[in-house]
Amino acid sequence: MRFKLADSLSLITVQLILATSTLALSNPGSSSQKHSPNPSAPSPKGISVPFFATLERLSRLVDIAYCIGTTGVRKPFNCVSRCNDFPSLSLINAWNTGPLLSDSCGYIAVDHGVAQHGDSGDLTAGEPAIVVAFRGTYSIANTIVDLSTVPQEYVPYPSPDHGGSEPPNEPEHTCTNCTVHMGFLQSWKNTRQFVLPQLRQLRLQYPSYPIQLVGHSLGGSVACLAALELKVSLGWENVIVTTFGEPRVGNEGLARFVDEVFYLNDDNNPEGREFRRVTHKEDPVPLLPLSEWGYKSHAGEVYITKQELTPSESDIYMCIGDNDPKCIAGADDSLWMTTRRLFHARNLWTASDKLAEPNGFPSRFKLWQLLFAHRDYFWRLGLCVPGGDPADWGRGRYQGLGPDTEEL
């Protein structure tokens, strides 16, 4: 039987409503897979204003990546979205390898950290940095359906692919019994030819600038794999990663590897971590692929406890370890039910007729619009229009974050 578009969307919407309205679900599997909130846990203590300013600024930078593949980002640093917020940035290049899970979009820019007046009259200044932003997906098909692929062995690249003949360095860390999601790894393989040569040149030109990797959704998983190659295979230091709504990239071995490479088990200075995995209340994507299949989240989580926009410093919690019950791992059962319903609905999506829009994606796959929690990271990410998503129109700067606010 062939479904009409409206029928398909109605069925899936009903599933979402049923999922989010259910308060309890017995999660099948071992007790290690059972995630429940800790009612006696203390309320989050919040984060500092400088760290909040850093995360908020990076969320706008990754939102700009959604202009790649649509209206574009042009030199010096122009786009129809939030580029005017960053007059100190200079675009180096942008790439777009295609629309599939194994493809990638993003841009490389240099932030010279010089305060200037933007079109709105506000001053914007950031610390000098080389910025690499990885776009997420426009399609829920990529986010949910394609997360079903089989993982494969993960081995960091032994040497850069810039044509040099020097032998690879002996890595300080080794990845033992690691597997990685095939689609994520292939996406990075397709991307590295556009990123690594540029980064090598920029490091020589700006040796004191840190490399800031930032990604949303599937772009977060690519940023993670890119960072591992830079840190382990190339031995580069001063690499900082910030992801928003990052899926689980691989198995427990890979999660442990990320923890070791970025020293994420050191809780003495959580705001000083070099890997920040930002998650959001009710966002199902950080829970995918499912733990039943052996996938595991790495540490470094920064949890936004407030569901609706806009959060404040007191709404954000610095999580401890890979599986902090006060963070996304302790999501109540309704979120786990939502996640499973979203995933198992893939049979309905793939069995339905393939009505495509001009960009090649079936209309029914645009269900990411229903997953606001996956898009609401300080701002509503994912739409390249003036001022960002219409949900953000009329919103000024976050209170307390003036042009002179120091960032971390």
Curated annotation (Swiss-Prot):
Thermal dependence: Optimum temperature is 35 to 38 degrees Celsius.
Keyword annotations: Glycoprotein, Hydrolase, Lipid degradation, Lipid metabolism, Metal-binding, Secreted, Signal
Domain of life (superkingdom): Eukaryota
PANTHER family per record: FUNGAL LIPASE-LIKE DOMAIN-CONTAINING PROTEIN-RELATED (PTHR46640:SF1), TRIACYLGLYCEROL LIPASE, PUTATIVE (AFU_ORTHOLOGUE AFUA_6G06510)-RELATED (PTHR46640)
Protein family per UniProt: Belongs to the AB hydrolase superfamily. Lipase family. Class 3 subfamily.
Role, per record: Secreted mono- and diacylglycerol lipase involved in plant virulence. Has a substrate preference for p-nitrophenyl esters with a carbon chain length of C10 (p-nitrophenyl caprate).
UniProt-recorded name of the protein: Secreted mono- and diacylglycerol lipase 2
Organism per entry: Gibberella zeae (strain ATCC MYA-4620 / CBS 123657 / FGSC 9075 / NRRL 31084 / PH-1) (Wheat head blight fungus)
